[in-house]
Amino acid sequence: MTEKKEMEVVKGLNVERYMGRWYEIASFPSRFQPKNGVDTRATYTLNPDGTIHVLNETWSNGKRGFIEGSAYKADPKSDEAKLKVKFYVPPFLPIIPVTGDYWVLYIDPDYQHALIGQPSRSYLWILSRTAQMEEETYKQLVEKAVEEGYDISKLHKTPQSDTPPESNTAPEDSKGVWWFKSLFGK
């Protein structure tokens, strides 16, 4: 078994430019998201204390599921884009903290496309500022993931609408049933 090289992460990430809405173009399946989720996206907002408010949303069977959390630099003294994200689960009774790694492996110079991973290579996200991504750009990000040692056979594209839904107009799955069902592979 060959040892995988350490992943390269972005250095000098401009956190303020990174804030805003990002659409999930593709990802590895996650037990924290419904298998049939569409229009999945994340919205990041800088808090006054320097942490980041995280809002992850997805739509499943016409209902909006969401979870909120926070992100912060894993090592405040490092210029590497290695963040920690923390969510409290389950969403309907948020009492258990779950912390994970969020490493920015690539960001284009205009901050329009990003590749996000973490050290175990169990999770991977391709993100875009727009709901659709040019195929050539997608292929370049997939190639970057391969270079970083990811098994892209697990990567699946996330269906995105041409006109993404608005958060305040969709019925909510307020009980977090999507999260609970996703634990059982539904």
UniProtKB/Swiss-Prot annotation:
Induction: By drought and heat combination stress. Accumulates upon treatment with 50 mM (beta-D -Glc)(3), a Yariv phenylglycoside that aggregates arabinogalactan-proteins (AGPs). Pfam families: Lipocalin_2 (PF08212). Keywords: Cell membrane, Chloroplast, Cytoplasm, Lipid metabolism, Lipoprotein, Membrane, Plastid, Seed storage protein, Storage protein. The keyword DNA-binding does not apply. Its main location: membrane. It is found in: Cell membrane; Cytoplasm; Plastid, Chloroplast membrane. It comes from the Eukaryota. Residues 154-174 are annotated as: Disordered. Residues 158-171 have a biased composition (Polar residues). Disruption phenotype: Increased sensitivity to sudden drops in temperature and paraquat treatment. Dark-grown plants die shortly after transfer to light. These phenotypes are associated with an accumulation of hydrogen peroxide and other ROS, which causes an oxidative stress that leads to a reduction in hypocotyl growth and sensitivity to light. Severe defects in basal (BT) and acquired thermotolerance (AT) leading to death within 7 days. Stronger sensitivity to tert-butyl hydroperoxide, a reagent that induces lipid peroxidation. InterPro entries: Calycin (IPR012674), Lipocalin_ApoD (IPR022271), Lipocalin_bac (IPR002446), Lipocalin_Blc-like_dom (IPR047202), Lipocalin_CS (IPR022272), Lipocln_cytosolic_FA-bd_dom (IPR000566). One of its GO terms (molecular function) is nutrient reservoir activity. It is a peripheral membrane protein. CDD domains: lipocalin_Blc-like. One of its GO terms (biological process) is response to paraquat. Signal peptide: none annotated. A motif (HPR (Hydrophobic proline-rich)) lies at residues 90-97. The keyword Magnesium does not apply. Expressed ubiquitously at similar levels, except in dry seeds (at protein level). Present in seeds. One of its GO terms (cellular component) is cytoplasmic side of plasma membrane. The HPR motif (90-97) is required for intracellular targeting at membranes. Belongs to the calycin superfamily. Lipocalin family. Involved in basal (BT) and acquired thermotolerance (AT), probably by preventing plasma membrane lipids peroxidation induced by severe heat-shock (HS). Lipocalin that confers protection against oxidative stress caused by heat, freezing, paraquat and light. Confers resistance to high salt (NaCl) levels, probably by protecting chloroplasts from ion toxicity via ion homeostasis maintenance. Required for seed longevity by ensuring polyunsaturated lipids integrity. This is Temperature-induced lipocalin-1. It comes from Arabidopsis thaliana (Mouse-ear cress).
